[in-house]
């Protein structure tokens, strides 16, 4: 389908310091494409400015309601560090800092939530503050696949390849030196993986297959 040039928006950005507004005006040129937009990754001092769209052809969505593909959020982090545990804090204020007491979970109801900082990607039009906090599950992914690890454990578990891949280096050396704990450790790790007891040492979750 032929694209008409007058349908291509031209963004003209004006920053108004007097009324603390970030205003975008829209024009429709007849002959050439041109676009200027707000790059929130470079103008850190303007991240919290509001703007009003004067585009009469479409509604403007609240920035905090945008889909994940249009925003960039920080990753949740363990409160006591990867693979570490500690006492229950006296208050829950750490959840407003993107920190989690426990990462992941074997069931959906076991997963904790925390508030992380997010910002809108450059050139995405929305209404309201371009930086905000969003509730997100305490789940991180670091490239560990369950099926791959299970195959390592079945076929190469005797030489501790599965433990090395999961990040248990010290235990992997012991398993390697004893050739899979004389076969017993090798079998036990397979069952631990299948039952969901054994996972990555950095508290990350298994990568989804989609």
UniProtKB/Swiss-Prot annotation:
Side Cytoplasmic, residues: 160-178
Signal peptide: 1-18
GO cellular component: membrane
Membrane topology: Multi-pass membrane protein
Glycan-modified residues: 91
Coiled coil: none
Keywords recorded for this protein, A-Z: Glycoprotein, Membrane, Signal, Transmembrane, Transmembrane helix
Major localization class: membrane
Record bears the keyword Glycoprotein: yes
Subcellular location as annotated: Membrane
Pfam families from the UniProt entry: TM2 (PF05154)
Domain TM2, residue spans: 143-191
Sequence ranges on the Extracellular membrane side: 19-138, 200-210
Segments traversing the membrane: 139-159, 179-199
Family recorded in the similarity comment: Belongs to the TM2 family.
UniProt-recorded name of the protein: TM2 domain-containing protein C02F5.13
Species for this entry: Caenorhabditis elegans
């Amino acid at each position: 389908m032929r694209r008409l040039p007058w349908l291509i928006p031209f963004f003209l950005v004006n920053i108004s310091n007097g009324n603390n507004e970030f205003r975008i005006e829209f024009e429709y040129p007849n002959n050439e494409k041109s676009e200027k937009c707000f790059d929130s990754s470079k103008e850190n001092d303007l991240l919290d400015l509001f703007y009003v769209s004067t585009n009469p052809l479409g509604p403007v969505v609240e920035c905090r309601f945008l889909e994940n593909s249009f925003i960039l959020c920080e990753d949740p982090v363990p409160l006591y560090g990867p693979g570490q545990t500690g006492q229950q804090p006296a208050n829950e204020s750490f959840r407003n800092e993107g920190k989690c007491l426990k990462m992941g979970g074997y069931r959906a109801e076991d997963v904790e939530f925390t508030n992380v900082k997010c910002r809108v990607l450059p050139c995405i039009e929305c209404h309201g503050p371009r930086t905000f906090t969003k509730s997100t599950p305490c789940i991180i992914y670091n490239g560990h696949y369950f099926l791959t690890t299970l195959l390592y454990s079945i076929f190469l578990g005797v030489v501790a390849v599965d433990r090395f891949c999961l990040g248990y280096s010290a235990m992997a050396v012991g398993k390697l030196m004893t050739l899979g704990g004389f076969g017993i450790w090798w079998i036990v790790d397979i069952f631990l993986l299948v039952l969901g007891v054994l996972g990555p040492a950095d508290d990350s979750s298994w990568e989804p297959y989609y």
